[in-house]
Amino acid sequence: MSEKTLATAVDKRRTFAIISHPDAGKTTITEQLLLFGGVVREAGTVKARKSGNFAKSDWMEIEQKRGISVTSSVMQFDYQGKRINILDTPGHEDFSEDTYRTLMAVDSAVMVIDSAKGIEPQTKKLFQICKMRGIPIFTFMNKLDRDGREPLDLIAELEDVLGIEGYPMNWPIGMGKELKGLYDRYHQRVALFRPEDDAHQYLPLNADGDLATANELEEDGLYQEARDNMLLIEEAGNQFDAAKIASGDQTPVFFGSALANFGVKTFLETYLEYAPQPASHQTPDGATVAPTDPEFSGFVFKIQANMNPNHRDRIAFVRICSGEFERGMDVIQERTGKKMRLSNVTEFMADTRENVETAVAGDIIGLYDTGNFQIGDAIYTGKTKIKFEKLPQFTPELFVRVAAKNVMKQKSFHKGINQLVQEGAVQLYTSYSTGDYILGAVGQLQFEVFQFRMQNEYNSEVIMEPMGKKTARWINPDQLDERMSSSRNLLVKDSQGAPLFLFENRFAERWFQDKYPDVELTAKL
C-alpha cells in the first residue's frame, strides 16, 4: 500500500469506546448504531431476556442471563464512507480494569448518561481516564422518552462534577409521555418524535431559529420553551469550539432515546463530523509512533477465551497503531523477541467473526492465540524495536482460595484457570507454604463470573473459600525471607513468580514495616 493510499485509509477510521454507569443504556445505543451500519436487522432488547432476543454486543451466556455487560465487545461496520470500530465496555465497576485497558485502544469516547439520574459514580471514574488521556468525549443524554431531570441541570452538572464544558447540539421538546421532539439548532431543524412517516421527520428552521413553515407545533408551550432555552444558551452559554472538543475540554451533548431509536442517527452523523482519526501513540522513551508510519505496529489490549465454546479458542485483541496489516505477514513480539506469522486473523461483530486480509491503523483485529500473548504485548515489523506505554493493572482487594471440586478433573481445572487468568479479569496467586491457588479481584462479581465460566466453558466445578479483603504488597525477592510470613501476612507469588504479602489490613502492614524497616513494599497500580 502506497503512503498516500495508507493515509487515505487511516483517515476513514473512527475508533471509540462507549462508557457509562450500568443501566444507562450503553448496550442499547450500541445496538442502534449497528442497525444504522446495516450489521443487524433489528436491535436486541436487553430487557427481553425471556424472548431470547439478546443484545448483539452481550454475546457471553452469563451476560445474556443477567442482562449486563461483563466483557468488552468489539464491533466494526461501515457508515457514510467511514470504517467505525466500536468497543462496548463493561459498565459494572468490578470489571473496570477491562474497561480502562479498552480506553487505551480508542481515539474518542461516547459517554451515555441516564437523563433521569445524571452523572453516576462509574461514569465519573471512566470519564477521568478519558480526561487523563486527553481524548474527545461526546455525550448522549439517554432515556428522553421517560421523565427525567431538567436539561439545564444536566448540562450544568457536566461542568460542576466533571469539569468539562457542555455544548448542547439539540434540546428536548418535552420528555416522557410529553416528548414531542428535539430542537436541533446545529442542523437548523426540529426532529419530531414518532412522526407520521419518514418524509415528515424533520421541520426546517429559518435563520432566526423559528419554524420555516407554519406548523401547529409553534403554538405548543413545550416547543416555545425549548426554542427559548436553546437561544438563551447560544447567547449566554458556552460557544461551540471544535478545538476544545478535539482536546477533550468541551463535550457536544446530544439528547435522545436509544430504546426508541430517537436522536441516535443525528448523534452518529454529527459524531463522524468531529471525531478524530487514529492518533499517534507514545513509547515509554517519549518517541511517537504515527498511524501513517509505513511499518506495522500494534498492542494487545485484551485477551478473551472461548468466544467460540465449541473450539475452546483464545483471541488476542490488537489495536493497530501504525501501518498496514496483511494476512500472512511476519511480526516480532517485543516482549520475547520472537518472530511470528499472522495467518489466522479475524475481525468482529461481538461473537461472530470474519477472516481479515488487510487492516490499517485504527482498526481492531483478533489474533488466534495458543498462549503466546499477554495483555500489553507489542508486535511490530521493521528493524526498530517498538514498545508502547504500559496498560493499567489494578491491585486486587478481594481474595478467595480456589480448588477443583472433582479431583479427577484437574486437567480441565488447570486449563480453565490459566486461560481465564490470562484474560486479566482476575489475578492468580500461589501460596508459598501450601501451593494453594488464590484468586484476587477488584469486586465480587468477577469471582461469580469466573465460577460460572469454569463450570459452563470448562466443565469444571470449583470450590471457592472467601478470604475477605486483603492489602497486597510486593517485595523485592532479594529482601525476602520466608520466615517473615505469619498468620497476618500470607506470603504468595503472582503469576509471574514475583513474591508478595497479603496483609490482613493496613494495621498488619504497618506492624510489618515497623518490624522490618529496611524492607521495601510496593503496590502495583
Swiss-Prot record:
It comes from the Bacteria. It is found in: Cytoplasm. One of its GO terms (molecular function) is translation release factor activity, codon specific. GO terms for biological process: regulation of translational termination. The keyword GTP-binding applies. Keywords: Cytoplasm, GTP-binding, Nucleotide-binding, Protein biosynthesis. Increases the formation of ribosomal termination complexes and stimulates activities of RF-1 and RF-2. It binds guanine nucleotides and has strong preference for UGA stop codons. It may interact directly with the ribosome. The stimulation of RF-1 and RF-2 is significantly reduced by GTP and GDP, but not by GMP. This is Peptide chain release factor 3. CDD domains: RF3, RF3_II, RF3_III. The lineage of its organism: Bacteria, Bacillati, Bacillota, Bacilli, Lactobacillales. One of its GO terms (cellular component) is cytosol. GTP binds at residues 20-27, 88-92, 142-145. InterPro entries: EF-G-like_DII, EFG_III/V, G_TR_CS, P-loop_NTPase, PrfC, RF3_C, RF3_dom_3_sf, RF3_GTP-bd. Residues 11-279 form the tr-type G domain. Pfam families: EF-G_D2, GTP_EFTU, RF3_C. Belongs to the TRAFAC class translation factor GTPase superfamily. Classic translation factor GTPase family. PrfC subfamily.
